[in-house]
A protein has these predicted regions:
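Functional surface patches built around histidine and acidic residues
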Residues: 1-187
Length: 187
């Protein structure tokens, strides 16, 4: 995969990534046992490189400049057909059927669900959303710890109500996919 003309190869030594991309802006823990090296200083070249035992083991990008075996961001999603049987690769399309992002992760299930991993996931989601928003010329979001704390407490209160039913979450707007879609589409 290339991002902004810079190559990322699975199984490459981490020193190659550091020489090519520089020091990551952040290193996040994952539930899969490896670390994400997060490059988010320029959302038009946003990428995350999974590193374990000093080797590249995973990658993700939704950069507008990515290229993977001749497939580029914005190409017709049908170009990914050759990889349908390869569970290590996941390709994501935008609402118009164009290739939007690629994930290479040979691990299917994570085992670590610690507080630090949950925090990392929230930061990664914010970066992925901001990269998408940047690609579509929308204002990026800035993390607000006070708002995060208030939202967390509000969701805990909601979930602890005695009359809680599983479908109430979806009906009330707490459905994570609905929230994600609203974040991507809002100005």
């Amino acid at each position: 995969v290339t991002v902004g003309g810079k190559e990322i190869r699975v199984d490459a030594n981490v020193s190659t990534i550091l020489d090519t991309f520089g020091e990551p802006n952040r290193i996040d823990q994952t539930e899969y046992g490896f670390e994400w090296y997060v490059y988010d200083s320029n959302y038009s070249e946003f990428c995350m490189v999974g590193v374990e035992a000093d080797r590249v083991c995973a990658l993700y990008t939704n950069s507008s400049s990515f290229d993977f075996n001749g497939m580029k961001s914005g190409d017709d999603y049908s170009k990914t057909a050759d990889y349908l049987d390869n569970r290590c690769y996941r390709f994501y399309a935008d609402s118009e059927g164009h290739l939007d992002s690629i994930l290479y992760n040979p691990r299917y299930r994570g085992v670590d669900d610690s507080t630090s991993v949950k925090r990392s996931k929230s930061m990664l989601l914010l970066d992925m959303i901001n990269s998408y928003r940047s690609k579509h010329n929308k204002t990026i979001y800035v993390e607000d710890s006070d708002m995060n704390a208030a939202a967390w407490l509000s969701s805990l209160d909601f979930m602890n109500e005695k009359e809680y039913e599983s479908d109430v979450v979806t009906q009330s707007g707490y459905d994570v996919f609905s929230v994600y879609r609203q974040l991507l589409e809002s100005d």
